[in-house]
Regions:
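A short, structured active-site edge motif that brings together acidic residues
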Residues: 40, 122-137
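Acidic, Mg2+-coordinating phosphoryl-transfer loop and its flanking beta/alpha structural elements
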Residues: 157-192
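Conserved Lys-Pro-Asp/Glu-containing loop-to-beta segment of HAD-superfamily phosphomonoesterases
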Residues: 3, 137-166
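N-terminal helical cap/lid subdomain that shapes the substrate entry/recognition surface
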Residues: 2-89
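Surface-exposed amphipathic alpha-helices with a cationic face
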Residues: 88-96, 148, 166-170
């Protein structure tokens, strides 16, 4: 049995506008000029960057700043986050092919169901896995290992858009597909790069 594991933001869900608006609303409150959307998106997808320092000039953000960010992000995420074109159809094809489908996101586990249901794709996933105290964020491979164990699959492939995703797949010794329709750029080290869902489907079908 095959399992196809999908990252969420930048792969299934386009949350770029929500992230962009949140960062710049916080910056506005700190009397800072807005940042370019492309810079913000690239920064959040690269491991090891001090985002508080780069976005707000603060080395260690206060609890109130963190809470303010989370509150604003939830608001904008609910307003702006949508599925990328063709992704729902891709998930349906996986379902019709009798593949198991799992979502593995660095977002907190308790926030995932709402956005997936809003975009009418929640029921297409066999398992939904988010970060929690017990499950570390990618690039740790724990989520991918959990996806395999929960579905009992003998073969697995991970579809994502960032270096964190690619490293997570590498750490799990799993084939990886880098999508370039969202936040992601072509990876020189990924086994597969895809520009659209048709290309993604060909790889998923034949791995």
């Amino acid at each position: 049995m095959k399992v196809v594991i999908f990252d969420m933001d930048g792969t299934v869900i386009d949350s770029g506008e929500a992230i962009y608006k949140t960062v710049n609303e916080v910056r506005d409150e700190l009397s800072l000029a807005p940042l370019d959307k492309e810079f913000i998106i690239k920064a959040i997808n690269e491991p090891g960057r001090n985002l508080a320092l780069e976005f707000y000039g603060i080395d260690t953000p206060s609890k109130s700043l963190k809470e303010g960010f989370e509150e604003k992000f939830k608001k904008f995420y609910d307003e702006c986050a949508t599925t990328y074109d063709g992704v729902k159809e891709l998930l349906q094809k996986c379902k019709e092919a009798k593949f198991k489908i799992v979502l593995a996101s660095n977002a907190p586990h308790d926030t995932l169901e709402k956005i997936l249901k809003k975009n009418e794709i929640y029921e297409l996933f066999d398992e939904v896995i988010g970060a929690s105290k017990e499950i570390p964020q990618k690039p740790d491979p724990a989520m991918l290992h959990l996806a395999v164990s929960k579905t009992g699959a003998s073969k697995a492939i991970f579809v994502g858009d960032s270096l964190k995703d690619e490293l997570s797949a590498k750490n799990a010794n799993m084939p990886y597909v880098q999508v370039c329709w969202g936040f992601g750029e072509e990876s020189k080290t990924a086994a597969y790069n895809v520009k659209n869902v048709s290309e993604a489907w060909e790889i998923i079908l034949n791995f």
